[in-house]
Amino acid sequence: MRSKGRARKLATSNECAYGNYPEIPLEEMPDADADGITSVPSLHIQEPCSPATSSESFTPKEGSPYKAPIYIPDDIPIPDEFELRESTMPGAGLGIWTKRKIEIGEKFGPYMGEQRSDLKDSSYGWEILDEFCNVKFCIDASQPDVGSWLKYIRFAGCYDQHNLVACQINDQIFYRVVADIAPGEELLLFMKSEEDPHEPMAPDIHEERQHRCEDCDQLFESKAELADHQKFPCSTPHSAFSMVEEDLQQNLESESDLREIHGNQDCKECDRVFPDLQSLEKHMLSHTEEREYKCDQCPKAFNWKSNLIRHQMSHDSGKHYECENCAKVFTDPSNLQRHIRSQHVGARAHACPECGKTFATSSGLKQHKHIHSSVKPFICEVCHKSYTQFSNLCRHKRMHADCRTQIKCKDCGQMFSTTSSLNKHRRFCEGKNHFAAGGFFGQGISLPGTPAMDKTSMVNMSHANPGLADYFGTNRHPAGLTFPTAPGFSFSFPGLFPSGLYHRPPLIPASPPVKGLSSTEQSNKCQSPLLTHPQILPATQDILKALSKHPPVGDNKPVELLPERSSEERPLEKISDQSESSDLDDVSTPSGSDLETTSGSDLESDLESDKEKCKENGKMFKDKVSPLQNLASITNKKEHNNHSVFSASVEEQSAVSGAVNDSIKAIASIAEKYFGSTGLVGLQDKKVGALPYPSMFPLPFFPAFSQSMYPFPDRDLRSLPLKMEPQSPSEVKKLQKGSSESPFDLTTKRKDEKPLTSGPSKPSGTPATSQDQPLDLSMGSRGRASGTKLTEPRKNHVFGEKKGSNMDTRPSSDGSLQHARPTPFFMDPIYRVEKRKLTDPLEALKEKYLRPSPGFLFHPQMSAIENMAEKLESFSALKPEASELLQSVPSMFSFRAPPNTLPENLLRKGKERYTCRYCGKIFPRSANLTRHLRTHTGEQPYRCKYCDRSFSISSNLQRHVRNIHNKEKPFKCHLCDRCFGQQTNLDRHLKKHENGNMSGTATSSPHSELESAGAILDDKEDAYFTEIRNFIGNSNHGSQSPRNMEERMNGSHFKDKKALATSQNSDLLDDEEVEDEVLLDEEDEDNDIPGKPRKELGVTRLDEEIPEDDYEEAGALEMSCKASPVRYKEEDYKSGLSALDHIRHFTDSLKMREMEENQYTDAELSSISSSHVPEELKQTLHRKSKSQAYAMMLSLSDKDSLHPTSHSSSNVWHSMARAAAESSAIQSISHV
């Protein structure tokens, strides 16, 4: 049995050991001793009448300050032989004084009170312990009308003052007299053990929570220590507790005896005395533990801050406030005033008007009044039970500890413990529709031409090309998926999303908002066999714009496979050869991707300069259209004949699908330029009108549009400044809508094509066009001269420099349509041309396309749909009835509105507060959610003041300024002299040295090969993807001849490709990758000197390029480099490498192209060969390159086309890349 609050009950005595210390109150209870209730009949208390009680003996008492007037409660009956008056213990209040002599052995009790689980006031209660020293329950007598007169017996301040001890007998507390008590003396209870007679602080302050041994009265900090102590017999006599129970004779007669018994072992830290060495050693463990709260004026430390504060009062002697009526001292004047009100003048001055009960404080009276008014302001949130006191509510709420999830959300079924948490959850849950099977768009809208969307029909629509559902397997996802986890499409997108999942005004007009062209004009404008109709979606203008500036080079293709051309067509041969993707007027890329410039300033600046360049499109096509009009009509005869057979929507789907396939073909030509064309097969089987790539998705990608939706009359010439201050998106929209010009001429024209004798030959300057080559699109930024006119190279600048052009030779044309520039929205990681983890290049791709529902919500195709939808909104101003037409179509592109609900498995229990309304991801803090939302919205609020780059995260902006502009690299590697901007990057770099990955040796493991190959591949992929970005995002350069345009693209622009790649991917790369790219940028500047070798982390560079004038030699070199790479032992890995054998040496061709730019000599060219490269490193580069290229192709792939499959070089490249990526995915898992 022990008292829970002994430390707070302790008060120092002004007579013994505490004379030198100011009295420190440990707790003041306003109503501790002064609550009066008349519910119990009171006994009349007489004055002391014992014969032994003389006036002399009471003189000091009467003359002491304790005789100050205090309130004597009469609610508890006091026996006649005792009286209740001021205690001699400072701060204790009232005490029990005897009127007669009490001898040793008398018992008083039991201690009365309420049985509770815990003590409300530890000064008026006891804890009842079981045999294992566990608290069974508590006896609480803190209420004024509860308990017996025993609760007024106070604890002694010193050991020699006590005359009573307490013991527990049968779950009851009794007091036993252990010393003779003379009349007029106060009954004082045993408090401290005999080893603490002179310690200024109570034992509980040092030991926090004591556990007493009933045999020797030794205190322990934990029950485990007490149990260990009780395993051995105690060396000290039995304590007073055991004496009461066993009726033993009290033999502790003097303090000197205790000194002899307990003075053997002293603690050097706290001066405590222990009976034996074992107890002292256990006690010393408490000093070895680190205590969090240490006193700054003495070496003492405490585990609780309250104990430290209480201890520091002993040092702050000048900050005490003494009571004038008693010896009590306070550290705060408010505590002193509260003490005076409750114990002295004006005590319990607040009386209840209803029952007359008085209270020391107004708050106590206010709380008491709730009883009379039946007001219960404290309500349980779980069961809505109400209480008048908050403590009662807290006690009640513990009952709900085992059933905290009692309230269920009616919408999603999630359980909550309180109504407040449920209400917070409903903000995100109510009004949502959970994912369910069914069409994504308007209900009842079926795909034109197909009664049902089953797997068989999808395969048939794709013309035997395996769709993505077949590609990823049939047992992983339901049948009819256009991409993983997506049900079928309806209305060109059946079953992609549940209807009503997003809310947005309909965007697709049911009928053309503008008048169409005549059939003759359409026939003239349909230049590509893949384009059955002239209209091209406005969302596809970015790639088209870049196509005009950077035609991908295809000169390294074997010419012997090209059809024969007539002599009249030779002036166009060079142009056609250089741009395999130039039959494309418009390619759709989702804004926000890294295939285009993602920063807001780049978007706006490009937009301003595009208008000047693109308005000249029609002129260049008019100059070339006459020889091609007949052929265009013939090649599209089948499609035009189908107009009378199929519905308009089917024709429109065919047209749009062809446009997208052309887009893919354009990107493929760039990839083929960098990845090389060696190993491609079936080029001689190419046919006119063939699909450039197998359909990656079995259904048409874009929605259907009517045939006459996009008329594009000629534009007039108007000059705009090349570089202006960036404008806000709203200003850009105003500028676009206010202009009468269209940013792009979407008219397409096809050149006449005739067969050419097969055989190796160099490309000549005579114009001719192969039937397999896409048409050359000449946008306003590129002049289409008939010869090989040379112009000055493009300057190294992100925005380019305006060049002179033969603008006087171009007929002007009018524009009636203006399309809104796309704003970044979905920044899907598949578009972010980031450096994938070198350990598994295909991991990000697998994660993107194999993730569970609802990952398809942000598939790259959906990003393209969103961009297209945004651009379609710009048509609302073209025609008065356009807005009505837009509203007549079901909502298809409601991507901006939050989903109605998310699947229950996505809703986390609790913390539903910060949930992404687009993808359902949950974040612990609002700042994390804000940063995450920028990945959906494309917002980049942090703009660099030096280069107008924008970032979505402020830390990326700071790193950009520090590393790019300030060139701060204070951390230098002592092994290779490489510098880093951060210490962590240097440490990561040094680990590569330690692991041997920086040596470039062939003895490293495949994992280390991947790491060491990353730096080599960085330059290649940066060059490749930078050109694609320029292909998409830049239209600020003057016209160039075709040959010099290629030199510009791979020449001077090659110097800033690393910086541009860094700026485009700064938000996506980690710190080391940013540092690496900055270093690569500096290295590229050194490469401007022709013939200067390039260093790349101590590894031999692999990039080789083929001079344009030595095509035959380059082709022979590439053929000689086709030695089979060393295979890994894994069988599945062999298939992955063999599938990509045709792009093994894309790095070699890249270096050859660079040497062409720098005009390497033949000797230098022959000295560079891929034979110097370890085969294992080649395989690493092949795996990474194929995954990067495959991701690029996959993001722009069409789902279906109505044309037969072709075997063009681009088609073969894409088909094999896809198969290799599939096998490599399996290999990557097994490899890891």
From Swiss-Prot:
ZnF (C2H2-type) residues: 211-238, 265-287, 293-315, 321-344, 350-372, 378-400, 407-429, 914-936, 942-965, 971-993
Record key words, sorted: Acetylation, Apoptosis, Cytoplasm, Developmental protein, Differentiation, DNA-binding, Isopeptide bond, Metal-binding, Methyltransferase, Nucleus, Phosphoprotein, Repeat, Transcription, Transcription regulation, Transferase, Ubl conjugation, Zinc, Zinc-finger
Residue ranges of the region described as Disordered: 22-68, 548-622, 720-823, 1032-1107
Record PTM text: May be acetylated by CREBBP and KAT2B.
Motif residue range(s): CTBP-binding motif 2: 774-778
Comp. bias regions, Acidic residues: 25-34, 1068-1088
Compositional bias segments (type: Basic and acidic residues): 562-577, 608-622, 791-805, 1044-1059, 1089-1104
Enzyme class, UniProt record, top EC level: transferase
Ranges of residues in domain SET: 80-192
Name of the protein: Histone-lysine N-methyltransferase MECOM
Organism in which the protein naturally occurs: Mus musculus
Lineage: Eukaryota, Metazoa, Chordata, Craniata, Vertebrata
